[in-house]
Curated annotation (Swiss-Prot):
The gene is Rnp4F. It comes from Drosophila melanogaster (Fruit fly). This is RNA-binding protein 4F. Gene3D superfamilies: 3.30.70.330, Tetratricopeptide repeat domain (1.25.40.10). Changing residue 132 to G: In RNA edited version. Changing residue 396 to G: In RNA edited version. Changing residue 84 to G: In RNA edited version. Changing residue 381 to G: In RNA edited version.
Length: 941
């Protein structure tokens, strides 16, 4: 016994004299969480001041740690309570929860202190900032006091019956500060029941767990924890740590751990497989090695990839990783990342390899942006493999079986193998949102979850999102809709349970948020409508509406009265509709009172009598309720900061002058009005006098990509159709010139490609491609119009640009239709049209009276701007005028009818001669066709 103590002291002395760099020389320094405490925190001599029994325990623990050469030893004379755990070196999530650090600092006792951002993800900085230890000092009392304070904080938080998310994060941080493995494990597992534990927290926990792992059973339990940690988030640091552990241990017995790990990470990290191949070569049993390789081929689809396939996968992976590194939090998945999935689908690989690469894209995306719900929803849509239409000629059963097989291949066989329900659960546990909660509830209903299971999941989500009132209300409404769909109205027990669910939801919202929760009374309105419709109890529905209208402020809201009246009218036979509307219009003030009054009048006209209609019309409309304006804060910014900056100093000086009397104000207003009129006239004259090509607009200060590219490109704007240039639209946002050149180069020689951008450097999704020959452009239109390019159906057409816009100020109203005009007087044109009509309508050469009447009518219509009528209609009008003329002739004096035949013949011949002369005068020899011809008419001598 004395020899053992002497050996321990000798080893302790050698360890104290050993340089620090020798202590840190270890293969696992990159992931090591054990740090030698500095002299300020405690010196090795502190162990001698303790009791002999504690000292002996510390030394025995120290010897046990030294007996393991693979892993770094602990500090001399220290136990597990003196090991300091630092944060991991893995890449944390980009999304940081605002106020998360403040939630963890000194808020152990404040249960109500939380914010809406508490539903965010956990960052490593939060764990480091929680429950900071007091400042370092040389005295043992300070260190002991800090430890006692942390211990008290941990006990107080752990004793809470229902912990909030922020409190659980604080609990984990305190546990890591205390360096107590049992506390760390219990706090991590407790958080695991509520939310998804991030990868960097798992990494810290595994490093602390490995320190005390020695026996085979402990190593087996440790590997089980590694497998559990790998099933939450895609994390390269975590996978590297597990792979390095297995390689250093020479562990090839855990076939499942290796196979599932490579199934998830071999796409990005083929070096993991290379390390495993070197270990497989050391297996002496050929049957065991063959079975292991067979399992790897079954799980990891990239295990047997050749060099060419690896190169194709590597190009897509590297491109996506670069894009992901450059991507910030403000992006749109459907517009930005959809092209990467399309690139994978166009590769000449089998479906298993494509699905593996696409899963990698999704897993890396949700690992970096875990709170972006659209990523989780897109991932779920990919796994579901829905939206594929069955052809008419194909057998539906065979196609369905094929789709089921393809869907099974999309799931993968690694630790991150998730169905759509598992993905929705992961997304909700990572960061709940209204869309994700709705999707998760829908998938649980499709999977035939029991009501108790659904209630438990909803309870966990509500516990997580208690700080977000709007999301909580939406989740309650989604849950109530689920209960309505799954309630049998003929079962009294289910009906009572449904009513209890409505009552519980309303009471819980009232307790949590008071009068601020569900101010539109959507829960109660839904309950009332269910009572009216599905449960067939209008009395209960009316009672719920009376409860709604009894709340403060609801009686002045006209839309609520309208909904109440409509339910009574539609589902209760209109028994209480009149009373509801009369009570609404009897309010002193009312929002949307006109809508209520109009509805009341329509109802009375449809179902009422003369007396009831008159009584309804006699009701006065209440005063419109005007919401009080919110006070402007002193530090609030104006909505028009530019206008405030551009105010002249004269207006600021005028505020200091004496107020003007009425006459001075009238004169000032008159002068301002005259100045405005003069400015408008001056602007109109200036726009009229400016030549079309003489004045040049000032150069724009904004130099966007469109301007820069216009200088670089050889394109020239043409207002006419360009038969050798094509116009392409509906392109994906990340489109480049090289991609378009590659797309259209098979149809001919491309001279230039131009992408059109906005001034804010945003791509419009359109481009111009110019070919050398028109035939090449025609072939490009025929070959590429409507084709699928990077996930988008593009449209290709011959370029026919509209007239180029000018820098003039556009009118605020729609511009009038412009018609091409010339300098030829419209009278001559009308005469030409009338002459043509004369030739067409002339039935006989001698019928002068009818033709002259038709010419007059035609000229009159043209002069008034009326539309030209058809030939049949004109003939009918002409006959009517001839009949009127004959009737007028019958009323003339008889003396005129008794004229001689000779005199009548002379008059008719004179009329014919005059008509011929008039016809020759009205029809010129040559109608001017242009401005030059028109000038020649007036330049003749």
């Amino acid at each position: 016994m004395d020899a053992d103590k002497q050996l321990e002291r000798q080893l302790e002395k050698e360890l104290d004299e050993m340089p620090a760099e020798d202590l840190d020389d270890d293969a696992y320094d990159e992931y090591d969480l054990i740090v030698i405490p500095d002299q300020g925190k405690g010196s090795p001599q502190q162990g001698h001041s303790e009791s002999p029994q504690q000292e002996e325990e510390h030394k025995s623990e120290e010897l046990r740690q030294r007996s393991r050469p693979t892993w770094p030893p602990s500090s001399a004379g220290g136990d597990m309570t003196t090991i300091e755990l630092i944060s991991s070196d893995d890449e944390p999530s980009v999304e940081e929860t605002e106020g998360g650090n403040a939630a963890g600092r000194g808020r152990a006792r404040n249960d109500s202190s939380s914010s809406s951002d508490d539903v965010g993800v956990i960052e490593g900085s939060e764990l480091e900032s929680n429950s900071e230890v007091s400042s370092d000092s040389d005295s043992d009392s300070d260190n002991a006091g800090g430890g006692n304070q942390l211990e008290r904080s941990y006990q107080e938080l752990n004793a809470l019956p229902s912990k909030k998310f922020a409190q659980m994060v604080s609990l984990i941080g305190i546990a890591f500060k205390l360096n107590d493995l049992e506390k760390i494990e219990s706090s991590v597992l407790e958080l695991q029941n509520l939310a998804t534990v991030p990868a960097h927290v798992w990494l810290k926990y595994l490093k602390a767990r490995l320190v005390v792992t020695q026996t085979d059973e402990e190593r087996k339990a440790f590997e089980e924890q590694c497998a559990k940690a790998l099933g939450y988030y895609y994390s390269i640091p975590l996978s590297e740590y597990v792979v390095n552990y297995l390689v250093d241990q020479g562990n090839v017995q855990n076939h499942v751990l290796w196979a599932k790990l490579l199934a998830d990470y071999d796409v990005e990290r083929p070096d993991f497989g290379d390390k495993l191949r070197s270990l497989i070569s050391t297996i002496t049993d050929e049957n065991e090695a063959a079975a292991f390789v067979e399992m790897l081929q079954k799980h990891c689809v990239t295990w047997t990839c050749n060099v060419e396939q690896r190169q194709m996968i590597k190009s897509v992976v590297d491109k996506f990783k670069q894009h992901l590194d450059e991507t910030t939090r403000g992006w749109d998945w459907s517009e930005q990342h959809k092209a990467h999935v399309y690139d994978v689908e166009t590769l000449s690989l089998d479906d298993d390899l494509k699905n593996a690469v696409i899963r990698f894209i999704f897993e890396r995306s949700v690992a970096k942006f875990p709170i972006v719900d659209v990523l989780w929803l897109s991932y779920i849509e990919f796994i579901q493999f829905e939206g594929v239409t069955v052809p008419e000629n194909e057998d539906e059963n065979e196609v369905t079986a094929e789709m089921v097989a393809k869907r099974a291949k999309r799931l993968g066989k690694g630790f991150l193998r998730n169905t759509e329900l598992d993905l929705a659960n992961r997304g909700v546990r990572s960061h709940p949102s209204v869309q994700l909660n709705h999707r998760f509830l829908d998938l649980m209903e499709r999977s035939d979850f029991e009501l108790a299971e659904v209630d438990e999941e909803i309870r966990l989500i509500l516990q997580r999102i208690v700080t977000d009132m709007d999301m909580t209300v939406e989740l309650h409404l989604d849950y109530l809709a689920y209960r309505i769909r799954n309630t049998n109205a003929s079962d009294e027990q289910q009906v009572a349970s449904l009513r209890a669910a409505f009552n519980h939801a309303w009471e819980e919202l009232t307790v949590l948020y008071g009068d601020q929760a569900d101010t539109r009374y959507e829960v109660l309105q839904l309950w009332a409508q269910v009572e009216y419709t599905q449960l067939g109890s209008p009395d209960n529905g009316r009672e719920i509406w009376r409860q709604i209208m009894g709340y403060p402020g609801s009686s002045i809201r006209g839309l609520l009265w309208l909904n109440f009246a409509q339910m009574e009218s539609e589902y209760n036979g209109g028994h209480g509709t009149r009373d509801v509307l009369r009570k609404a219009l009897s309010q002193p003030v009312l929002e949307n009172g006109l809508m209520v009054q109009e509805f009341f009048r329509r109802y009375e006209r449809c179902y009422g009598t003369y007396e009831s209609i008159a009584a309804c019309q006699a009701l006065d409309l209440p005063v419109e309720y005007v919401k009080p304006r919110s006070r402007i804060k002193p530090n609030s910014q104006s909505a028009y900061p530019r206008q405030q900056k551009l105010k002249p100093r004269q207006q600021q000086q005028q505020t200091n002058r004496e107020p003007l009397n009425r006459e001075q104000r009238r004169r000032q207003a008159h002068e301002q009005q005259q100045q405005q009129q003069q400015q408008q006239k001056h602007g109109i004259k200036k726009s009229r006098t400016e030549p079309s090509g003489g004045a040049t607009s000032p150069p724009s200060k904004v130099k966007g990509p469109a301007n820069a590219e216009a200088k670089e490109s050889n394109f020239k704007y043409s207002p006419n159709m360009e038969i050798n240039k094509i116009f392409v639209r509906n392109l994906h946002p990340a489109c480049s010139k090289e991609e378009l050149h590659e797309l259209f180069s098979p149809f001919g020689t491309i001279k230039d490609v131009r992408l059109v951008h906005k001034l804010n450097k945003q791509f419009k999704g359109i481009a111009y491609v110019e070919f050398e020959k028109p035939g090449e452009a025609q072939r490009a239109v025929a070959g590429r119009d409507g084709c699928l390019f990077k996930g988008m159906n593009i449209s290709v057409a011959i370029s026919n640009p509209p007239p180029r816009g000018t820098s003039a100020v556009k009118p605020s109203v729609a511009p009038k239709r412009r018609v091409p005009t010339s300098l030829i007087p419209t009278t001559l044109v009308r005469q030409e049209v009338a002459a043509k009509k004369l030739r067409l309508l002339l039935p006989e050469p001698g019928d002068i009276s009818s033709t002259s009447a038709s010419v007059d009518v035609a000229i009159k219509r043209e002069a008034n701007g009326e539309e030209q009528k058809g030939d049949v209609q004109e003939r009918d009008e002409q006959k009517g005028e001839e009949q009127k003329g004959e009737e007028q002739k019958g009323e003339e004096p008889k003396g005129e009818e008794q004229k001689g035949d000779d005199q009548i013949g002379e008059e008719q011949s004179g009329v014919e001669q005059k008509g011929d002369e008039k016809k020759e005068e009205e029809m010129p020899a040559a109608v001017p066709k242009s401005n030059d011809d028109f000038r020649k008419l007036f330049l003749k001598d």
